[in-house]
Amino acid sequence: MYSRHCNIPYQIRTSWMLTALAIVLIAPTPTLAADPRAQELERRTREQLELEQRLRLLERSGPLSPQAAPGPPPPLPVEPCWQVRGLRLQGNTLISLAQINARLQPLMSDCMSVTRINQLLTALTALYADAGFIASRPYLAQRPQDGQSLDVIIEEGFVESIELAAPDLPISLRGAFPGMLGKPLQLRELEQGLDQLNRLRSLDLTADVAPGSLPGGSRLLIRPRTSAAPIGAVVSYNNRGTEYIGRNNGALTLTYDSPLGLNDFVALSTSTTLDQTSAYSRSQSLYYNIPYGFWTLALSAGHSQYRYPVELPSQTVRANGQTRQYSLSLNRLLWRDQGTLLNGMLRLSSKRSQSYFADQYLAIQSPSLTVAEASLSLLKISDGLWNSTFSYAQGLDWLGADRDEERLSPALPRAQFRKYRADVSYWRQGRDGQWSWNSQLALQYSPDPLPSLEQMLLTDDYAVRGFRQDLVQAANGAVWRNTLSLPRRLGTQWTLSPRVGLDVGWSKQVTGAEGQRLAGANIGVGLSTRDWQLDLDYQRRLYGPPPSSHEPGFWRLELSLQI
């Protein structure tokens, strides 16, 4: 049964916190169909939320205490023994007889003493524990007798109840541990259930195991180590906007853990330019996910709009537009160990863009797309933090999307495109935290001319830095970012982080076209506490296309406050 109260039994596992950096992912963004930086913010917000939740799984459910490799068994004492005729097992359904024989055969002899029998039972218990069945136990069916087989019964056990020590927590044990009741206790399933709960910022839970009231039964107690408010907010300001839309930007993100009591999560984000002019860029997005065992279903919706004046020789006209995006994704945990998460994801997206210039509709810059995407994501902690995603996207003609056969020219962007993308990030910290290095590589390739919504943005704060006015995006491209930081503690709450960065990029619009190279540099400092962070950077372009303005370098300021 599922319950919400229990006495605290003995603890079966320990956890340790791994210091990890939430690496911001580089994502493909649109071009003239909408403000590219607004689209970048919407995509990046969703991917950052997903990454932070995956990081919490590893931080809050770290590895078991390391165990030394078993040495050679000590010499057996001289004691009475039984002349047994082989070993007979009963009750083994979870581990094959061949595996059991391979483990126990070296311990068998014609004369089995009490010490040797105990070694055999211990080895059998360890074999089940290594396979994740931590509540299984073997015992002798009867007293050994000369001339008889050694009879061993394996009680593989079952989960009798799953109980919550804090009944006021708004979580669902049934959704976190589906199908576990009545089945043998499997450590991987237990850890996965805890992972699904601990991915929420406000929860930090652990599990204890106690004997049940029925023979072979086990009671699981889920209890909190710490807890926080389920509602959170992040307010931020930055001046990384463009001159033609507005320099100053503000953003607000609200999060709510388990609003329906189903271990779900919802985030609402909005951003807007703050300059009081006729130009603006605004975006709003909604992200929701709900887990069930090893699966997670996610929904997202976003809307962005922009407007800015364009000065012509004889008059000033207005460019404006909007983009709507909706997506449904299904994520499956494929593999997990103490420092690795491997996830597979399928996503179906609908994207609609409308662009106008001087009140005239721009059909080519207003694609309607339906996109299916499959990806694999690997998050691994070893000597540093590795985060990589490999994806394939295919444009479809579903749900009212544009059709390739309706294009006026084969050279125009394809709605039924093919696109491959790889993102690899590595973060490493020096001894005693004296330095940290963050390296990010993003690659995108498509054999087709891509719509603006699917092109890769190469010049941005999260791509090649130093290009505030000049936007470069293409169907094919690569970006390699590197940042070296020297964090220093100031007292007990403050951290000062000087840093320097160097980025390079390469782009090619279509196969056969001439490539374009980019390079930019960054030097800055960050000051942070637990709840807020201030970043000040000087960015400068080193190499790239002819600039649209005479801005050789610029200062970037960003302030964020977590409530």
Regions found by a protein language model. Give the residues of each.
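Outer-membrane beta-barrel "beta-signal"
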Residues: 254, 523-532, 551-563
